[in-house]
């Protein structure tokens, strides 16, 4: 099992092995190999116990910190602050979501048991072109609305691209407002685009709603809008292959709260002296030109969204 980001979520019902995992790390932390636990990792693994957790955290650096939902403050803003401004990587074991933390839809796992073996498997899977669903399904009709999470460069790009089509673009304003927006538009055929890098908290409810309305709602979760622009290949002379293939090798988790933040800064820095100079408030014209915008849309294309 490879930890890639600063926040990893492990969830599941009682009896699936979540607490056992935490207890084994805690036992190894206390007594090492005498605990009977074998733990192999490239960096220290520690368990954060309920007692004096603040002082414990202050002594952990560049470690993988396992935290069980039994910790009373695990969902508090204070704990979230410690997670976001730390050199550590956190594995949070909880059945509940964390609305105050930006974690990826790709870093939510459950423990799968096969005989005496246990493994981590993603709760949500990319079913092609960054579209996520609880069950395999495909929209049976074209979409009438493209809904995105922001009102800035991403929304401006989509609005420009579909200006001469029958597809309407709308903004939910924030990722947390997407569910409420969908609740009020049951009769519409909606293609949702949101930044997967920070959508983990909302994935369960939004994807369950999509499963109910699978004929009319599709949820597309690329890493971020900036990631789409970088992946499209429209910026000539920019070699981003290594960064896109293994972002974890380039991203300092203490500096960037999520991969979304990293890709925004990376794109801004790399395009500073070109016609693609990126500004989150206003999409550069160069990205919106016909062939360029078509390359971006090809990464998420679905029915009449292309």
How would you label these PLM feature ranges?
Residues 36-60:
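Short glycine-rich substrate-engagement loop in P-loop NTPases that contacts/grips substrate
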Residues 66-67, 88-97:
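Structural recognition of the conserved hydrophobic beta-strand(s) that form the central parallel beta-sheet
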Residues 27-38:
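Post-Walker A helix-loop "phosphate-sensing" segment adjacent to the P-loop in P-loop NTPases
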Residues 16-18:
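Conserved glycine(s) of the Walker
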Residues 21-23:
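Post-Walker A alpha-helix
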Residues 72, 111-306:
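Acidic, divalent-metal-binding catalytic cores of TOPRIM
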Residues 52-77:
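Conserved P-loop NTPase "ATPase switch" module shared by AAA+ and STAND
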Residues 10:
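Hydrophobic anchor at the beta1->P-loop junction of P-loop NTPases
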